[in-house]
């Protein structure tokens, strides 16, 4: 009797066996409707086997209408991800089919491609870049200064693939970034791209999946999950802002969408293009060893000039209590307002203040579920944990010593900078962009429209505003706390700080007027600032690679992280210690166990073991063997993170 193994997103570990009806002809990759518990689900035909008659097996009901199939290339990607990231097949299947499409056929509107595109003229440098893109058969890095027109170059490439009848995917790290790109796309190509991100409804996702499976959708702009869409005829993948940490998923299936996209491009025989003004260290390493081709765009588009960058030594500033904008920056903002030009104030910290404490007994308000401070949000009049979302009221007296009027709010958040700016510049139009202030694409689009139409004088933003936005009249950027994030005990803290400051500075002077960037710092001699100030990003990459090589850290080695978590701190630590004690002998370096930087998260205590090995070592095989040696207690949850990006 022939059995089909059906991969279901509802079953994480392995495909389930189903009987094949005699009148049903199936192929690997076909989408079928199967009974599962008390409902019917869509599954993927994974493989076939012949077994003696089995009475208890359920029978496949039918093929999904229109005989839709998942290509062998996507199936290969699922297998690769399961092996490389040590993830359950069903969890990866849910990435490919996030909604069930086992329903009556949905009428999908086909994207009408008009090849008479109105693309703008390219500069000579951009034309050379396009020629290199056409000539290369490797992954390509477009490394261009902020505002160099990387988007215009890959728009030309998209046009070429659409003319060939191919599908194209443009990946962006944030939903917020998509608004301006979509508008530019519609302006250039004359039709709407399909958008795929967390704001897309379930019904819309069903329609999009159908359209892709029927090859009616030609161009998708999406977040990291768009990588798993079941394209039939994928010709091009573009990863914009490839360095961004948002491409790494830290829950569910732990994967890096950038790295997985490169693998997918090999399966689909598609061209892949990585874009960034500040590429990741891993990408620069691959470029240096010849694995990737590199295109350098050294000039800003339409001859715009790069901004000047100046340090402000905050140790020499005498500021009033609870004020955070230096006299130099205030004067520059006043100048900008007089010249009718826009200003961006950047602080990568949400809320009003990062800490509330008691001046009498020293009590700090921390999250009851996490090892983190509660952030003061004045606008909502609440304390909030930015890790698990727990909220509480703002107290009038200390809950520990009961002292009245003893509570102090420490440090600035973005709301506090807004308050200070409104006091200093009462007649200016001020807006704030952060996850708390703009929670959906419509709000973002509205704010961007206001910026473009000069309805905002001062924009105050978190890292949301650093990625790819183009405001021609924005000529001044003030970084309120340039030290934030640069001194963390983290492999990538210097890299992240450099990228963030470089990107936010790149928002200034993208139009006809030259820009100015001020970095406020209590440690102005930090070497990172000199790299940014003197436009020596290549020196930064060389130095950072040397540091990593000396420490035998990625990209010169492989790394995996084993995270153990549970509600009993002592028991979890004992499991972690025992795991290290029985680790198989091999050419690996094992560090830990140690408390994660976030030692308690959502009520669970967390310990981390790091494993470092030579690049040629089969780390996954080693980890599988190691995990088979230990019986994991039910109170302990284990996650494997291959190529970890953070250590929180």
From Swiss-Prot:
SMART domains: DEXDc, HELICc. This is Replication restart protein PriA. It catalyses: Couples ATP hydrolysis with the unwinding of duplex DNA by translocating in the 3'-5' direction; ATP + H2O = ADP + phosphate + H(+). GO terms for cellular component: primosome complex. ATP binds at residues 144-151. It comes from the Bacteria. Pfam families: DEAD (PF00270), Helicase_C (PF00271), PriA_3primeBD (PF17764), PriA_C (PF18074), Zn_ribbon_PriA (PF18319). Component of the replication restart primosome. The lineage of its organism: Bacteria, Pseudomonadati, Pseudomonadota, Alphaproteobacteria, Rickettsiales.
